[in-house]
From Swiss-Prot:
GO terms for cellular component: cytoplasmic side of plasma membrane. Keywords: Cell inner membrane, Cell membrane, Membrane. Disulfide bonds: none annotated. Interacts with the SecY protein in vivo. May bind preferentially to an uncomplexed state of SecY, thus functioning either as a chelating agent for excess SecY in the cell or as a regulatory factor that negatively controls the translocase function. Gene3D superfamilies: Syd protein. It is a peripheral membrane protein. This is Protein Syd. Belongs to the Syd family. It comes from Escherichia coli O157:H7. CDD domains: Syd (cd16323).
Length: 181
């Protein structure tokens, strides 16, 4: 596990939860995750769940993705998706508004790995350098990804070679995020 990335993710999650507490006097609330089982759920309303991060349980790697492509995945990606269970968190990096993707449960972790594999299949078919997404943007064809060759974080337009460098590594990217509520 990459300790710098794990700590940066935990620190951002704490900043996000603290901002939510300050604004709403509660743990984060999600309507999107209502009805989806998770160890993160503290309580449920009639159409939403309150959640708090929980330690990840299970194997702390995305080896299924590695096996599917017979490649080595950046250690930061293993760490990013297996440090904790949490809800997705809205954030800002510079002037970019994003939703930082998180693993909600063990079932969700399997789905995340399947989505990462699908993403890599498309990139391989289009002969694009491999990236692994970590966040979504309002523009549906853009994501924030980690380049699997360099470990750099970039904004990428799906299905194209268009990439904008954002940070030299995932820990630095996470450390620069500001919570958005």
């Amino acid at each position: 596990m990459d300790d710098l990335t794990a700590q940066a993710l935990k620190d951002f999650t704490a900043r996000y939860c603290d901002a939510w507490h300050e604004e709403h006097k509660s743990w984060p609330l999600s309507e999107e995750l209502y009805g989806v089982p998770s160890p993160c759920i503290i309580s449920t309303t009639e159409d939403a769940v309150y959640w708090q991060p929980q330690p990840f349980t299970g194997e702390q790697n995305v080896n299924a993705v590695e096996r599917a492509f017979d490649i080595v995945i950046q250690p930061t990606i293993h760490t990013f998706y297996t440090t904790q269970f949490a809800g997705d968190m809205h954030a800002q990096f510079g002037d970019i508004k994003l939703t930082l993707l998180q693993t909600w449960s063990e079932d969700d972790f399997r789905r995340v790995q399947e989505n990462l594999i699908g993403h890599l299949v498309t990139q391989k078919r289009l002969k694009l350098p491999p990236t692994l997404f970590i966040a979504t943007l309002e523009e549906e064809l853009e994501v924030i990804s980690v380049c699997n060759l360099s470990g750099e974080v970039c904004k990428e337009t799906l299905g194209t070679r268009k990439r904008t460098h954002l940070a030299p590594n995932l820990a630095e990217f996470l450390n620069q995020l500001k919570p958005l509520l």
